[in-house]
Amino acid sequence: MQIALVLLAIYGTTTTNTLRIDQCGENALGMQNGDIADSQITASSSFDKQSVGPQNARLHSELASGAWCPKPQINSKSYEFLQVTLNDTFLITSVETQGRYGNGTGREFASHYMIDYLRPGSQWIRYKNRTGHVYMDGNFDTTTPVIRVLDPPIVASRIRFVPSSKNTRTVCMRAEIHGCKHEGVTYYSTVPDGSRLDTLDFKDSMFEDSQIYTESGIKRGLGLLTDGFVAQASPFEKNQMNNSWIGWNRDTTDGRITILFEFEEVHNFTDVVLATFGNRIDGIDVIFSQDGKTFPLFSQISSSERQSLNNTSRRYDFRVPLHNRAGRKVRISIKFSSDWMFLTEVHFTSAANLTLLSEKIPPPSSAATQQLLVVCGIIFLTIFACVAYCVSVCLKRRQKNKSVDSNVKKDLIITHMGNKPTCHVFPSNGKLSNGHYEVANDILYARSQKSTLLSVSSKSTFSCRAIPPTWTDFNFPPPPEGREEHTYSQPVSPENSSNGSYKSVRKIQALKKYPSSALLIGKAIGEGKFTMIKECIIFGGLKCAHKSTKEEDCVHGTRALGDEIACLLQCGRHPRIVELFGVDESYNLLLEHVEYGCIRNFWMASEAPLDTEFLVRICKDIYSAMAYLESIRIVHGHFTPNNILMDGEFHAKVCSPRGPSHHAQLRYSAPESIVNNEFTHKSDAWAVATTVYEMAYQCRQRPYEELTNEQIVDNACALLDHQPNAVVPLMPTVFNYEILQLLTRCFRVDQLERPTFERLVKPFQD
């Protein structure tokens, strides 16, 4: 038996290995459609990685908060960038940008930007266009995509968008890149680099500032000879710009020039065409190198132009057949005898080189055949074992998911009560899975800022199917607006005091469930963003507050209820924390009814100012509740006056502990919460002290009353940077010295310098 072994070596179909822009088209490279993966999109910084990280900078996409936004504000001296790493070297013909629309919440865009790029073997290069400008005109609003054609185009494997602004401002971007794969020249160098004679300057004015050189010190890069533009007019015409031709004068060059072209890979070349201007080229020598170092003489091809009777200078193409010579570098030496020799473009063309090797091989022996069968059998068994293992793992996971579906009906939770308090929610983990935390002294930090978002059906069932986050899952818009209070979130799960996991299924099953027939639901007494609270009487006369979603199929409200119940189940009963009685058949919450509602409404309704003794007693109740939450490692996360309810005996109760995973009102948030999205017991200490500050003014003066939301964010940054112009609330002198000192320490920028709630509650108890 004879086996014919055929080796087919293909070096590529017929292609032009220089910039042929007309053949490239305007293909989008994948920012919008996802061909460019999230891992390929990075940035120098992000205001918040999840909501406005670089992965959200996709054109025409409303991911998370709608764009990439750098952490600092942008000015003319900034260097913040959005970087896209491509899988290969591409010819980039245009770029397209948008601002941050954020489904109507965004107002940020880049009016100007610069482009940096690199390719294999280069450093970062700042792009300049044919007229020498480096600034690109960007966007004028947040929605309209603006495309900018790159003239000359860019050859790059990585590209950076660098926003710039004359005035310091917040900037956000989305982007797309257009072009095609590049297989042509990656670098060239000329000796000499063009001639300058009197007022005539024909050097390569568009040559890249690549800062890379040959061994002999000649600068390497791309420029006029590979920009895809072929000039037709004479270089001496007055309206002809000198950035279309490179010219060499015979007197300054002795009529000899050398150009070295470099490619990423070895090519088989069929011809090279020189787009030139003059009366004749005396001779051309083309020599090839496959290893990039040696140029063997046997590879050299020489050509000359026929003598012409017409000595008039003209624009013409000079073609040299290259006979499928192989090379990674090509060196062209040109001789000319006219006064000037000009080039505007050099085109290489390569063609497929098919090498067929047919070789007769003797038939294998029986022993060799047996060995081959054994090897094939082992490979087959290995593949079969792997497939069987994967199938078994999938079946186990499916069974596990079914068991969870049958045990857990819905992820639940409560929010605060009172007259129209602010209520925001975040995407919760339906399974109430283990939180990941580290404890440093008495501070509870979340280690992971990512959460798996679990789908919740409209039929009160629970599913462990992971779904990707969308912009509605985040309430952390990076640039603050001046009209409404902003909220900030850190999507992680609260931690259990003992081992970091809730026994959620058992506790939910242990919750008392009341049938609808046993409930008499009355008028509304409060509402949040997705939830509402109504008066309710349970059969037997027990008065409570009925908490439900505003809309039946509101996923966000359902998640909010589920997240709050997780914290309340861990809290158990505490005299200063609102109690959870149970749920109804639809898993709406039945909460302790607190007679006078929110402390702010209570205080505003009081005809006469309340005395300091009453304020101290309220503070004692608050700090008692917060010290208990601290002891079981629950971070409240969004403390404001709306979270303090007044009962019939004029004691305060804290409601809506949500863990470090939820939102805080901007004016009550610690600087690390605003800037770094970090929520701990120490940030709670800041928020509670800010609430006490407002109560000390009878709830008639908001914190930072004179500052806009934008200025509050700037102030938080200034605090973290220890700038002297930063401000903090100044506590009024209505308390004794010890309490005043402790409350003042709550506004320390260094979290470790803030007192614990255990320490804060002591002077109020005394």
Curated annotation (Swiss-Prot):
InterPro entries, sorted: DDR1-2_DS-like, FA58C, Galactose-bd-like_sf, Kinase-like_dom_sf, Prot_kinase_dom, RTK, Ser-Thr/Tyr_kinase_cat_dom
Principal subcellular localization: membrane
Keyword Chloroplast on entry: no
Pfam families per record: DDR1-2_DS-like, F5_F8_type_C, PK_Tyr_Ser-Thr
Cytoplasmic topological intervals: 394-766
Keywords: ATP-binding, Cell membrane, Cell projection, Disulfide bond, Glycoprotein, Membrane, Neurogenesis, Nucleotide-binding, Receptor, Repeat, Signal, Transmembrane, Transmembrane helix
Tissue specificity of this protein: Expressed in neurons in head and tail, some motoneurons in ventral nerve cord, in PVP interneurons, pharynx and stomato-intestinal muscle.
Residues spanning the signal sequence: 1-18
Stretches that traverse the bilayer: 373-393
GO MF entries: ATP binding; non-membrane spanning protein tyrosine kinase activity; signaling receptor binding
Similarity annotation: Belongs to the protein kinase superfamily. Tyr protein kinase family. Insulin receptor subfamily.
Domain notes: The protein kinase domain is predicted to be catalytically inactive.
Name this polypeptide is given: Discoidin domain-containing receptor A
Species assigned in the record: Caenorhabditis elegans
Designated gene of the protein: ddr-1
